[in-house]
Structure formats: C-alpha cells, structure tokens
C-alpha cells in the first residue's frame, strides 16, 4: 500500500451533493482495504482561470493509503465523472493527517468572523 494525496474540484452547482461525492470516493478506498487519513472540504472557491466555462468550484482534499489498482480506479472514475472538473493525484512518502495550510487559513477566517460578531 502506498500513500497518496488527492485534490479534486467538483462542479459548483452540486452544493447539496458534496458530502455524497466525498463518501463515494472514501467508500471506494475502504472497500479496497485502504485507509483514509484526512478529508478536507475547502468549500466553493474562485478559480484562477475558467475551466469548462466555470469560474468557481468546490475543492476537496483526501489523503489515503491504497494499492496502485485502487488509485487507477479512482483516477478513471474522476475522468469519467462529468461532475468532477479537475483532479490531481500525488504520491506521498507518509500519511499526512495534520490540517493543510488551506484548511488552517479557513479555520482562522471562521474564528476571526466569530469573534467579530
């Protein structure tokens, strides 16, 4: 089993289905005897440039431990799923479980807004 970091962008009109999409991919990992070490939903964010005529997308980060066959299955699913705008799979040397810099920034913004109310 190897460690991977996956970032994928979901169509912005699917706000109610984000959790089911995340659940779908985590289920694929766990059914293949893999482990999910980290799940982060970064929310709806502005894209740096239009992708498929869209200017916003929901970003999701997964850190997983799976076999190469499962990664190929996930990659194929990302490519054939019309709701996934873009995806990137990167192999890592170890399991990453701490919050990403993006998630830390989101949490700081939420705390800042909570204290200003």
UniProtKB/Swiss-Prot annotation:
One of its GO terms (cellular component) is cytosolic small ribosomal subunit. GO terms for molecular function: small ribosomal subunit rRNA binding; structural constituent of ribosome. Pfam families: Ribosomal_S6 (PF01250). It comes from the Bacteria. CDD domains: bS6. One of its GO terms (biological process) is translation. Keywords: Ribonucleoprotein, Ribosomal protein, RNA-binding, rRNA-binding. NCBIfam families: S6. Binds together with bS18 to 16S ribosomal RNA. Belongs to the bacterial ribosomal protein bS6 family. This is Small ribosomal subunit protein bS6.
């Amino acid at each position: 089993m190897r460690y991977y970091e996956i970032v994928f962008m979901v169509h912005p009109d699917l706000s109610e289905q984000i959790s089911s999409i995340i659940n779908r991919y985590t289920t694929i990992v766990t059914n293949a005897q893999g482990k999910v070490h980290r799940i982060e939903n970064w929310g709806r964010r502005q894209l740096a440039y239009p992708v498929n005529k869209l200017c916003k997308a929901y970003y999701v980060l997964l850190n997983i431990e799976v076999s190469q066959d499962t990664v190929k299955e996930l990659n194929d699913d990302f490519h054939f799923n019309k709701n996934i705008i873009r995806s990137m799979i990167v192999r890592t040397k170890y399991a990453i479980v701490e919050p990403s810099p993006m998630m830390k920034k989101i949490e700081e913004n939420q705390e800042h807004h909570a204290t200003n109310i």
